[in-house]
């Protein structure tokens, strides 16, 4: 049974089918080899072919290390144009994310191959019953392309994956494709130029989720003024394009909702604290990646009809320079009533999140709030791009989000929330200021700012600065927008006791 990929319009769909056959006929045959010298699915091959494979492994010093790929001469008994032997390391310890990466490596290896059919044999991997479906997930994630302004000449591949448990892999793959749809939405939104993706156009993309049963509400500038969302209004007032507050609600259960709040700065010039020209400002179309992530997560849950009550709050604005723009030294009033002295107009993300957090608390009474934002360069200095920064006082959230991140390869690392960083936010003329001390731990100071608005329920802040875009291909992400966080949050939402 072939399962079509639920890709966004800008992604090139691969075709997948799962079966339990031992067929070897294909343009490309893929086999797997572990670090303990086990080649899986060998029983399907003639003895002479097995001998040739073992000889190729020995001659090429192929260790079976995870991610290692060896292309070997095609044995005469196999009707294929190429055979790939893929190392999986220790099969007993593979995480889903590591299997995804193997799939991405295969997709990359076959990117320029003109032949379409690929036969993948995963039978015998008893410690990874979902290996086939997770492998397909990685292939699909890597095969995404943003083609709005550039045509793709990729050859669509037809992957035929042999598995031990057909029903289990088909069902799991269907759920993974829902997650892919969310990832691809987030990538599409983040890849789009800021001239095309601004608060109103983002809201229009969110409205498309109504067809999936998502309740979408868009607060216009007049609504923002009426509700006293003063921080969001202040950040957006320098642009000709007014700010919005976008809400996407998937009512998949009657439990108290989980709220995701995503920073949605569709272009960040820095305001009057303007960013340096060059690569830094050119990347600032991606400052809405947090909003893209939480909207993509809602889409993923809606497609698989997940039994979770999930609401995404996305404060959207452009941070621009004009005669109407916020200027350094301004004092603004947030929806919560706290006044903020704006000492740096380029520390605007925490301002829109403050009103977003307040709106989530006041209107949905959530059991948990997680905000997602490309917030601080300080986080990149501390952790680089291997880990996202996790800030929370909730030990269950630390454990759950850390585990979910390890499972899918979107890892998080806990950073400190400390009163000392809150003390840095004291202002002589307002309740607080929007920056800490120069040269201090900026990511922690920003998190302490957000904590003022997060409420008493469990809350976590994910600083994904450095993760929104990648300049080079990685295992499951082609160069461009990553959709980082959709897989992490989707796994967290669907794992047991995620709402505790």
Curated annotation (Swiss-Prot):
Binding, Mn(2+) 2: 263, 268, 287, 348
Record-level GO cellular component terms: cytoplasm
Amino acids binding Mn(2+) 1: 268, 346, 348
GO biological process: proteolysis
Signal peptide start and end residues: none
PROSITE patterns found in the cross-reference section: CYTOSOL_AP
Name listed for the protein in its UniProt record: Probable cytosol aminopeptidase 1
